[in-house]
Regions:
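Beta-rich interaction/scaffold domains
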Residues: 1-130
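Primarily recognizes the serine-hydrolase "nucleophile elbow" in alpha/beta-hydrolase
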Residues: 254-308
Length: 381
């Protein structure tokens, strides 16, 4: 009998293994999305064997407890540990900015050893595409808003074969709190909420424009799209007040609608974490403007929920989101929607399905669904 009877390799939210394991096949080739930063290995094996999983890339060798704050986020440990909560081994993938300049190649070794029965070894050769060609299609610029006295850096994708005689939908993608002080390029690198639409568009499917504004810190660290951080810090009575940066995004959007051939019946809005809060707030402020919403890991103001009536939306959240805890964010929001007759679709990942970095990171799954992207582009005012 083989030491390892079953091996599954999964990415966030997926129930399907990236490999079709055969104990007699010792090497496998896999490809993962550009915003994949961890793999979960689930094994069934003979308990007489010791399992060792290692990687030939520094960022793939360690787990949570190996992090040394003094050394930064990428100190290498010795081997990948087993995590009981996830019932598997978590192999981390590099997310430092230089790794996005070219495709990443990495070999993960899985060994089952026994003093009595010897050793079995398997290798998984991984490729992660960097999407550099797609990211280079986004042009960076800066919008100076005179009404709200803020500056909004942004990246804009326009199809390579843009024809002003046609009308194009536009997707507005709003990042979360962690991206306020990063380069815009990093936003495009580390999440697919913008590049996924551009990839489709470049192959002639769901052609569109994509706007990625950035919420820069102007006043203090509580600056965000909304008053979410102020609320968390006890400096606001609500997380739903729009900040000037978000109000300026609306002005920027109107400017682009005038400059480009935009189909105003098909303006779409998506956002993650605090950017998801902003999706709801912006849609409530302009309830007749947006044809569809994809809010991820966030919540809406229950007191104003009726303003969303008539706007199609597909909501994504994880049951074990440790930051936007569903019991006091998502659940009251859904109850208010049901009471107000607001229609929505919901994907609610069970605990443990989003395993890296935590259940909060549901956006590492939803934007890779062709069904989700096609659904959004099927909506129109």
């Amino acid at each position: 009998m083989s030491a390892i009877q079953q091996m599954e390799v999964r990415i966030n939210a997926s129930m399907q293994s990236l490999i079709d394991f055969d104990p007699d096949v010792r090497e496998y080739e896999i490809e993962v999305p550009s915003d994949c930063f961890a793999l979960k290995f689930h094994l069934k094996y003979n308990p007489a064997y010791y399992i060792s999983i290692r990687a030939d890339h520094d960022a793939g060798r360690y787990g949570f407890q190996d992090l040394d704050p003094a050394m930064g986020d990428y100190i290498a440990g010795t081997e990948v540990p087993y995590y009981e909560y996830y019932d598997g081994y978590i192999v981390r993938l590099d997310k430092r900015q230089p790794c996005f300049e070219q495709d990443m190649h990495m070999t993960i070794s899985v060994r089952a050893g026994s003093y009595e029965f010897g050793e079995e070894a398997y290798e998984i050769h991984l490729t992660r595409k960097c999407l550099r060609e797609v990211r280079q299609l986004f042009r960076e610029s800066v919008y100076d808003d005179t009404e709200y006295q803020v500056t909004v850096p942004y990246a804009l994708y326009v199809p390579s074969d843009y024809d002003p005689a046609k009308r194009y939908p536009i997707v507005v993608a709003l990042h979360g709190t962690g991206e306020r002080e990063e380069p815009i390029e990093a936003i495009l690198e580390k999440m697919a909420m913008a590049t996924a639409w551009a990839e489709d568009s470049e192959r002639g499917h769901n052609q569109c424009l994509v706007l990625v504004p950035q919420c820069r810190i102007h006043y203090n660290q509580e600056d965000n799209w909304t008053s979410l951080v102020q609320f968390i810090n006890g400096h606001s009575n609500s997380p739903f007040w729009p900040f000037p940066q978000l109000k300026a995004v609306w002005n920027l959007l109107r400017k682009l609608v005038e400059e480009y051939s935009v189909d105003e019946r098909r303006i779409y809005l998506t956002g993650v974490s605090s950017g998801g809060f902003a999706v709801y707030v912006l849609a409530m402020e302009h309830p007749n403007a947006f044809a569809g919403l994809i809010p991820v890991s966030c919540a809406a103001n229950p007191d104003k929920i009726s303003l969303l009536k008539g706007i199609p939306m597909w909501i994504f959240h994880s049951d074990d989101d440790p930051l936007i805890v569903p019991s006091w964010t998502l659940d009251p929001c859904l109850a208010a929607m049901d009471n107000a007759g607001v229609k929505y679709r919901l994907t609610r990942y069970p605990a443990g399905r989003i395993f890296w970095q935590s259940g909060h990171f549901a956006w590492e799954a939803c934007y890779h669904s062709q069904e989700v992207r096609d659904w959004l582009f099927g909506q129109a005012i």
